[in-house]
Amino acid sequence: MFQLNAPYRPTGDQPEAIRQLVDGIRSGAPAQTLLGVTGSGKTFTVANVISQINRPTLILSHNKTLAAQLYSEMRQFFPNNAVEYFVSYYDYYQPEAYIPTSDTYIEKDLSINEEIDRLRLSAISALLSGRRDVVVISSVSCLYGIGNPQDFSQSCISLVKGYTQDMAQLLTALVNSQYVRNDNELTRGKFRVKGDTVDVFLAYSDYILRIEFFGNEIDGLLTIDPVTNQVLEEFDSYNIYPATIFCMNPDKQAEAIRQIKLDLANQVQYFHDIGEPLYAKRIEERVKYDMEMIQELGYCSGIENYSRYFDGRKPGTPPYCLLDYFPKDLLVVIDESHVTVPQIHAMYGGDKARKDNLVQYGFRLPAARDNRPLTYEEFEGKTGQTIYVSATPAEYELKRSEGIFIDQLIRPTGLLDPEIEVRPCDYQVDNLMEEIRLRVAKEERVLVTTIAKRLTEELDEYLRRYGIRSAYIHSEVDTLERIQIMEDLRKGLYDVLVGVNLLREGLDLPEVSLVAILDADKEGFLRDYRSLTQTAGRAARHPNGKVILYGDKITPSMKKTIDETNRRRSKQIAYNTEHGITPTALNKAIESSPLIALMRKEQAEKAALEQKIHDSWKSAPWQQYNKKELEKASEKQRRAMLEAAKNLDFDTAARLRDEWLLMEDKLQAME
């Protein structure tokens, strides 16, 4: 089961917190709250609880950046266990919508991050493998529909060395599991056949599974490094999980389409009855086109809006989500619960309002409403025992824990909560520049928070203009890029990081000695008590930690933050004095996030493959052709490209297109 790997033992009030949490879980407590200050080792406490309880665990975070940090830390604590990452795989996502006031229809537009898609599949595969030593770090993506776990499990291909297996049946099974055959370029989610060998680049892993046949018998099962082609490991049996989370059971397709057509007829009749023939015509054309695509290709754009039919669910029932892939006795840890819980509450309402317009005006069938996130009540119904973790828990968490919370105020390093100073807003940027230069001289880092994305970018540009090595992050900065920027801050490539609300909960940056909060007296969402306390906590991992609140008045939130910080400081000072502890800096190794390493590896492999293809073009026979010969070859290449696209072999079509464009460039140069 779980094997905790840590170079240190629980200290301070960690042992008592671990004991209380473990006792609470074993006694059947439905919910507990861990009130732990920044830097007190809440993640280490949770890791100890997981290792003692030995249950599959879901750790829920409210944004991708913090989820990535938790993923990195948990991988270090549990190197021999399955630590997985499940967040939204969209780099960009514009949902389908209709705005009645301007009669504007917005089509769905998206960009999928293949690496995060692989990690999501890896999480699903680990849960369905039957392993109990699984920790999944997730964002609110775990609330959204991802397909029936039974269909996903049935699409799994089980292989056993020495058993009879017809190769043709295996290839058909791979296609049904959404793998694509490509004998030229073997990339993630594809397979190739060479003689008696089938190579499958697993969609959820970074290696190739080689299946060797001797007649109709499986003679070997090996994993291969895709770059070096070296054998990594041999197996007696192996399970191949599908290449996509959304698996359609062929047996359910006919019944699903019959039900869709029935609901379509009812909806068309409804629109005619209320005197809206335009909406009736619109929904009829759209759904019939989608049905033709599904029957011909097995999918259509926006197929998720028909998920209820293919899942076999009744109207109004919750979609299958990540939680359905866990066993019933899962443990749920909600990190920074004061933010995450309200976020879970908000997911359903926003989605419903958008879907209602699409249904009301004839763009989607009513079943589209069932492709949605869980309501909070549904989420609670699917979760097991829960631990809420926060430095500033809200009333809801305390109520669920029956008013009892577990304090964790003492840091193992003896570090105190930072001193807080209030300064006027006049010339706040000039004053900030002086403070930054003092920290830069000591090789310390600075975090600055503003109240708007535009101000973040403008301040970053201003600091750079005066020679400060600055960077900024906000919601429009790509997930993996945010992680990279924070790593670069720790390494000293930047001295200052400017942000809005991303510089709050959970960010672990021990080199930061100063947190500056601009416009701290602007009472509101980003300047309430919890936001100020969480932001101030970013300076609590440094012995010289200090917080400057720039404001012309002291708001109730500012006063509460200062009072609570002073209360904690007094307790921490008393504990240090009693035990003879001298506060010491947290020497945390700067280790690259595994997500960054995976991203770099993927980029290197892609670049190497592209270079190999381009090198082959340099020595291609057409490079020696005269103009007439090249024109003929170019036209032949163009036809081959169109034929490949017609056959839906888009990888081959793209490769042919790139070579054809080179031919066209050479033809233009000849003129």
List PLM regions with ranges:
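Walker A/P-loop
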Residues: 27-49
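Conserved Walker A/P-loop ATP-binding site and its immediately adjacent core
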Residues: 54-76, 82-91, 451-454
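Conserved helicase ATPase core of P-loop NTP-dependent helicases/translocases
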Residues: 457, 477-500
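ATP-binding Walker
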Residues: 40, 65, 502
